[in-house]
Amino acid sequence: SYFNFSNFKISTLNNQTTITANVNNTTKSDIPGFYFRIKALDESGNSIAEVEGLLDSVIKANSSSSIDIKASKDFANCYDIQIEKIKDID
């Protein structure tokens, strides 16, 4: 993959979840912004919540950007996460 997420932090307070992370471009080329989906998985690997996000700017080659998502979904029982790219920004 040409990008990865690091320094993932998930906090939940009063059914309000905040997700922050760095998005790292691991290539020698700029990559456009894109839509993505984060799924919270329980210990059995079942999806318990999901949220979609948008990285709305170009990430320069070998650099990173950050995301900050607030959602009214409860990720409190999250054991693992799954991230998938949905599509590039048109």
Task: Show the residue positions of the predicted features.
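Terminal connector regions
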Residues: 2-5, 50-52, 68-90
